[in-house]
């Protein structure tokens, strides 16, 4: 029977399936961080349990760490407590920790792939909703709750219902100035934040095969904003080359054997999907969010919708509520809206390729005098590689702040926050009410668009800086 990529990986990991019971999956990799792990470790201690496979667990500090310094004292009191607790728990249970000052510390969904901890065909979980990022490698990766974190620690297994499958085929090639961030925002804008609910998505097609691993990770990262639990891309030579030589990756002849197996991790010809979408990506323009959920997105040269554009009353109310919060009007042109802060970073767009894209636009230019721009590498490894290329100098000379690794302004859990009423051009993944600080206003976009906004001080078209 022909199978999809998702079905192949799922079926290969079922260790038990009783009658009228959910299948139990073996979990190959477990990533943890300081926010969702303390309760899980406490549960183990109360039950006097040890971890089943501490060697298959990797911990990092990312959510509430300071990006101004690698010193613990630079963190808030709550952050200090969470970080110290993780340090104690990982030491007690024998889990490797990428702590403050570690050369590999960074955002959980960036350090996993960087170290080769994420591999094709594995099951990978983390107490974080954007775990779908790792599906870019052909891994079955998804976010879990704190009680499930404890269950994986104790048993290295998890009960999981089998999802429906959806194929999203991407035909054509991007226009200049358009990136996978624009693609995923466009997809969510066209179909809504619930279209993927109950599905494992597989991205495929001409465009996908030509994408770098960094670009693929951006795409899978925001599958959750589309409503899907899982986003996957079949591994190929680009995947294998990215993994080769990394710390946790197989070595030598063993690596070649794994590559032969990984080549089988693609949907069979004739495999049936429960749903499918085909996109012509050549029509996509740089996308900008205007509201308070990731489906409220338009092209840079478009106007904000009018209430008459929606027939559904709930959609009409959602539009009015969003526009009231973000202080914008129906039928308003998005280009030219003043911004106060630019944030380039996060597990969506904090990789070296993202920083290169931003630096290409900022090189030899200055940011607007009324703009504060934060450039936050997703890991200390990304930071080092960027500095080796001189990107830090480009950012600093442009007037940006060059920070240490962390989640930073993606969420209001650390000191990097916007004040009430401040408008942020952000490369992160969510534009919810107060996401980047109480009363803050978020406009989601690509690193190229964010860099252009930093220069002009308003939402603008990045393509003017690319000779388009």
Swiss-Prot record:
**GO annotations under biological process?**
L-leucine biosynthetic process
Cite the GO molecular-function annotations of the record: 3-isopropylmalate dehydratase activity; 4 iron, 4 sulfur cluster binding; metal ion binding
The record, for Pfam families, names:
Aconitase
Classification via InterPro entries: 3-IsopropMal_deHydase_lsu, Acnase/IPM_dHydase_lsu_aba_1/3, Acoase/IPM_deHydtase_lsu_aba, Aconitase_4Fe-4S_BS, Aconitase_4Fe-4S_dom, IPM_dehydratase_rel_enz, IPMI_cat
Keyword Plastid attached = no
Catalyzed reactions per annotation = (2R,3S)-3-isopropylmalate = (2S)-2-isopropylmalate
What cofactor does this protein call for? Answer: [4Fe-4S] cluster
Enzyme Commission numbers on file: 4.2.1.33
| Alphabetical UniProt keywords | 4Fe-4S, Amino-acid biosynthesis, Branched-chain amino acid biosynthesis, Iron, Iron-sulfur, Leucine biosynthesis, Lyase, Metal-binding
Q: Which biological pathway?
A: Amino-acid biosynthesis; L-leucine biosynthesis; L-leucine from 3-methyl-2-oxobutanoate: step 2/4
Question: What are the binding positions for [4Fe-4S] cluster in this chain?
Answer: 347, 407, 410
According to the UniProt record, what class of enzyme is this? lyase
- What remark does the entry make about the cofactor? Binds 1 [4Fe-4S] cluster per subunit.
- Subunit text: Heterodimer of LeuC and LeuD.
| PANTHER family named in the record | 3-ISOPROPYLMALATE DEHYDRATASE (PTHR43822:SF9), HOMOACONITASE, MITOCHONDRIAL-RELATED (PTHR43822)
Question: What is the protein's known function?
Answer: Catalyzes the isomerization between 2-isopropylmalate and 3-isopropylmalate, via the formation of 2-isopropylmaleate.
Regarding protein family, the annotation reads: Belongs to the aconitase/IPM isomerase family. LeuC type 1 subfamily.
What's the protein called, per UniProt? Answer: 3-isopropylmalate dehydratase large subunit
Protein's organism: Campylobacter jejuni (strain RM1221)
Q: Which gene encodes it?
A: leuC
